[in-house]
A protein has these predicted regions:
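Non-catalytic pre-domain segments flanking phosphatase-related domains
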Residues: 1-41, 47-100, 105, 113, ...
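C-terminal cap/substrate-recognition subdomain and adjoining C-terminal extension
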Residues: 2-36, 131, 150-151, 167-365
């Protein structure tokens, strides 16, 4: 049956026309054959990094359930105390380390905790105008960038997740909704923040930079709908935390409308009351690189007579294993970012889909 006569129809949107055509043909070929597709979330299903934007939102709104002592513990947890690499200096050219940064962050957090987090002595607007908040914000972002630049991806991810400790899973989902709604409405692009020039502390004056904002990709949401409509199951495997992706991928206000049981992301352990603790739940593989393939092998393939995914979508090296390791995969959909997955673009199975950096929209070229 030709695509012209088929019931498979992807919205034209901003797809590269050839990519859209080949995706339609793939869906037509595998419709109602007990097949499935797997996708990354951040910068693949959406524009932007959901976990990063939650981290930004927590700082901007001081949404923490940690007392100062526990906060001080988690921001240092498992982080080596040796100096960072050459590129991670303060504005005076001094190379920094976790001890100097954490000491300053902890001192600022005590003030923020006593005056806003635990007791609203100041309004959010007032607390944001304090030197303590300015110093806290910039040094948190500096440290957040320094960790993956100096240590393992696992350490950096867990450090970020541990800032959610003390919240219930439902509280995290509510926070995820608030953060996602807010960041969908903000400009996308890099933001630079500088620490206090008055409260310089042990780390001195630093600048932090972060990539702010999120965008929905309607073409990807439509692809998921069309796959499902034709009997092809859709799975998400993400390196963000589970509760966050569950909200974005399944809440109908965002339009992806995926099944919650098909979401596999990072998971912390929790108490009997569903309060998250600062320990990873290794009953599930760590969903980066090889761990993404392990999720498919352990939890997904057995449902499909040990068949691999027919289609895999990703954008970065963390997705490379699941993009390349399954012989049944006919299309690798790469949502192209500069300098990412260049080693795969000559694979005959690859469809490269570009994006507009200024708008976050797909680029049909």
């Amino acid at each position: 049956m030709s695509i012209e006569n088929s019931c498979v129809r992807l919205d034209e949107g901003r797809w590269n026309p050839k990519n859209r055509e080949l995706l339609e043909k793939l869906i037509e070929k595998y419709r109602n054959t007990d097949s499935y597709a797997v996708f990354d979330w951040d910068n693949t299903s959406i524009q932007g990094d959901t976990q990063l934007n939650l981290f930004i939102y927590q700082i901007e709104n001081l949404v923490y359930k940690l007392n100062p002592q526990k906060f001080n513990e988690v921001i240092r947890k498992n982080v080596p105390t040796n100096n960072f690499k050459e590129g991670f200096k303060n504005l005076d050219g001094e190379i920094l380390n976790i001890t100097k940064l954490a000491n300053d962050i902890y001192k600022n957090y005590i003030f923020l905790y006593e005056n806003y987090i635990s007791d609203k002595k100041l309004s959010l607007k007032e607390i944001r105008n304090t030197e303590e908040f300015k110093d806290f914000r910039a040094k948190m972002h500096f440290l957040h960038n320094a960790l993956p630049g100096n240590f393992s991806e696992e350490l950096a991810c867990l450090w970020e997740f541990y800032l959610l400790v003390g919240m219930t899973k439902d509280e995290i989902k509510n926070l995820a909704k608030e953060a996602t709604d807010t960041k969908l409405g903000e400009a996308i692009g890099d933001v630079v923040v500088e620490s206090s020039r008055i409260l310089t502390g042990e780390a001195g004056i630093v600048r932090g930079i972060y990539d702010n904002g999120l965008r929905i990709r309607p073409e990807i949401a439509n692809l998921y709908h069309e796959l499902k409509r034709n009997g092809i199951d859709v799975y998400i495997i993400s390196a963000s935390i589970q509760e966050l992706i569950e909200v974005f991928a399944t809440d109908k206000s965002y339009g992806y409308n995926l099944d919650i049981e098909n979401i596999y992301a990072m998971r912390l352990k929790s108490t009997i009351d569903n309060i998250l603790v600062d320990e990873y739940n290794y009953e599930y593989p760590f969903t980066q690189r090889k761990g993404k393939s392990e999720i498919i092998e352990k939890f997904i393939k057995p449902k499909y007579n040990d068949k691999g995914p027919i289609l895999v979508g990703g954008d970065a090296v963390g997705d490379e294993n699941m993009l390349t390791e399954f012989k049944d995969t006919e299309i690798l959909l790469i949502m192209k970012r500069e300098g990412k997955l260049d080693n795969l673009v000559n694979d005959k199975r690859v469809l490269v889909q570009y994006r507009n950096l200024q708008t976050g929209l797909l680029d049909p070229k």
